[in-house]
């Protein structure tokens, strides 16, 4: 899964990143359906003078989509997803590796 992230107005990047490191990422990595979580700051566009359309990109290695659905329904994850919604707008893309 690829997640595209933009912070909401007024959210400081340091606050968001600290919340990710302290609360969100450890919980996601505890999920049976997730093997890996990697977050990236987007700094610029290659060969373009414009601003990047997203501030962060996250890759999540999921081993079982059905299990992910069950994992996300847990009380802990619902609470954390609510917190995430206060920090950022996210677009989640379910992807399949082909190369």
What are these regions (language model features)?
Residues 1-99:
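Macromolecular interaction modules
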